[in-house]
Amino acid sequence: MSLIEDILQTSSTVTLLGTVLFLLVLYLRSSGSSSEEQGKEPPGPRPLPLLGNMLQLDLKKPYCTLCELSKKYGSIFTVHFGPKKVVVLAGYKTVKQALVNQAEDFGDRDITPVFYDFNQGHGILFANGDSWKEMRRFALTNLRDFGMGKKGSEEKILEEIPYLIEVFEKHEGKAFDTTQSVLYAVSNIISAIVYGSRFEYTDPLFTGMADRAKESIHLTGSASIQMYNMFPWLGPWINNLTRLKKNIADMKMEVIELVRGLKETLNPHMCRGFVDSFLVRKQTLEESGHMDSFYHDDNLVFSVGNLFSAGTDTTGTTLRWGLLLMTKYPHIQDQVQEEISRVIGSRQTLVEDRKNLPYTDAVIHETQRLANIVPMSVPHTTSRDVTFQGYFIKKGTSVIPLLTSVLQDDSEWESPNTFNPSHFLDEQGGFVKRDAFMAFSAGRRVCLGEGLARMELFLFFTSLLQRFRFSPPPGVTEDDLDLTPLLGFTLNPSPHQLCAVSRV
């Protein structure tokens, strides 16, 4: 299907032409007032009126185009997504300087049209200002209280592992697609933390929420939604936007129903999860006369939606990449399983075992680096006028920290384009942290759930490798396994099947 067919359901030539002409006039008028008198802007390819650099961008994998442009224009450059000016930051040193050393300058979120459709400015991921600060602070505090990065989360993951293993065992070594089972296992961890309980993998409410969250993240990265972000007036003709909005509406109704059930059984002295804690805080503020606080229903619903979506797709996708890479490179799988057998034996792996499994830890980190699942991060904006590396960037300018250029920076990684666990090992085989490992981004917008994600990846990965030998389906060789990502907002493995043969 062509991009135009993907975007347009119907068209009114007169309406579209009139709108294009109107926007062209606005563009020409606005382009006359540049910031040249304030300072030199980052270089970049010359944009066309209205279209910007669209003809130079591959909207199906824009991160690849941006990496190529960085070779020509340097580590900071300007590109126009349609009429919208965007500054791209490339390479470890530049991204770190912006996100870490000048965190306040580059710390705001760019609320694109589709992100606004998601949250209307509420919640944790796609918000700015005092509301975002309060919601993020509250989320961090309470997620720690309910186990993020601590013993509580470990117990929840250890409870979930047997359910996932049971699903794998039911296939009896025959080829199957790991997508849904891994998605549901990971989704249950955040469900237990947010709602206070896990769901059965056959629960239609749960599977619907998990499947819709994954589909929505995939659609967000589609070429048609990127076109919508550039030209919001195209919205009525974009199929994927219609599907996204339906998913968002369904998600909101499902969260409202789950919250209603929790509210009916709420015990302020025994909070079961994030939702309970939020409801108690909201009730306390209202009883003290604070009726205009940030603790309102919209912030609750969208914060829960953010935590559920962000806490499932990225971790589940990374785990699936790990299993695929183990199947693709059996000699590396051999070394992981030898280390697990030698150090752990047949007992359950625990988080405290990580320090004694340096090779396995290196493999997990290298999986995250090479999988590069959020290549363009989530866009930022400048919170004020900024002078950065000699260039002037106006307040409110969209900024893309190109994470793929950090995770594959050839000045930081010895073999950036190959799967090489030695990137995280010293000469004695000990684990080595690498500063350029920014799989969770950095600065004010660093991933809220980094600690939880690291724990999930370690415990799920080691438990599965301890229990199963992963191999290609009959008739398929390791060389046949395709590592080309399925394009979307996150980079998923292409559709594939694996065989999980019991080692027990």
From Swiss-Prot:
The keyword Zinc does not apply. It comes from the Eukaryota. It comes from Oncorhynchus mykiss (Rainbow trout). Changing V79F: In allele CYP2K1v2. Induction: Constitutively expressed. It holds the Pfam family p450. Belongs to the cytochrome P450 family. PANTHER family: CYTOCHROME P450 508A4-RELATED (PTHR24300), CYTOCHROME P450, FAMILY 2, SUBFAMILY AC, POLYPEPTIDE 1 (PTHR24300:SF319). It is an enzyme of class 1 (oxidoreductase). CDD domains: CYP2K (cd20664). This is Cytochrome P450 2K1. It is a peripheral membrane protein. One of its GO terms (biological process) is aflatoxin metabolic process. Its cofactor is heme. Heme binds at C447. PROSITE patterns: CYTOCHROME_P450. One of its GO terms (molecular function) is heme binding. Keywords: Endoplasmic reticulum, Heme, Iron, Membrane, Metal-binding, Microsome, Monooxygenase, Oxidoreductase. InterPro entries: Cyt_P450, Cyt_P450_CS, Cyt_P450_E_grp-I, Cyt_P450_sf, Cytochrome_P450_fam2. Its EC number is 1.14.14.1. It catalyses: an organic molecule + reduced [NADPH--hemoprotein reductase] + O2 = an alcohol + oxidized [NADPH--hemoprotein reductase] + H2O + H(+). GO terms for cellular component: endoplasmic reticulum membrane. It is found in: Endoplasmic reticulum membrane; Microsome membrane.
